[in-house]
């Protein structure tokens, strides 16, 4: 297992649609372990393969709190099959958009079909933070980011700020 670099906006890879997998091989299992290690090292609760530059429909999530035992979940080829009409609003952050938090309204409950790390088809119905995180990460697989919920002007301001920080990493932001 190894910690990978997380790509950030404005990297165009993040806007690409990830490809489904035909089967789960040793390489995909290693990738899932790398995603978990990278996510935990970055204090994240979810990470999609595209965020480390790999265009495969794989994502990992762990919404457990620091006081709880870890509850890692991995999803291969996840597809949202059903959502509730009731919605909830969470302030979402993203490891690919540093220091940015946006309130986003999403369906409160979602049902997902996916393949697990052992290649078995599974179904999951979830709500709360897990539902929000899963929808967020599946958006990544479809080339959508949380800033896509904003106006073009706000999006451009955030991307410009992040680009400046990349060019001047020692610059202090107040």
Residue ranges and their predicted role:
Residues 1-174:
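Positively charged
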């Amino acid at each position: 297992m190894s910690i990978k670099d997380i790509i950030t906006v404005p990297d165009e890879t993040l806007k690409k649609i990830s490809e489904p997998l035909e089967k789960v091989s040793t390489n995909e299992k290693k990738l899932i372990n790398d995603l978990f290690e990278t996510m935990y090292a970055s204090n994240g609760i979810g990470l999609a393969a595209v965020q480390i530059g790999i265009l495969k429909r794989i994502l990992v999530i762990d919404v457990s709190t620091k006081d709880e035992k870890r509850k890692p979940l991995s999803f291969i080829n996840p597809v949202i099959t059903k959502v509730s009409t009731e919605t909830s609003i969470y302030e979402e952050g993203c490891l690919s958009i540093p220091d940015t938090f946006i309130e986003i309204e999403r369906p409160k409950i979602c049902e997902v079909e996916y393949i697990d790390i052992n290649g078995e088809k599974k179904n999951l119905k979830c709500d709360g933070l897990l539902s929000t995180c899963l929808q967020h990460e599946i958006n990544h697989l479809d080339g959508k980011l949380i800033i896509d919920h904003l106006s073009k002007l706000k999006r451009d301001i955030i991307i410009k700020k992040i680009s400046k920080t990349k060019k001047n990493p020692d610059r202090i932001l107040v």
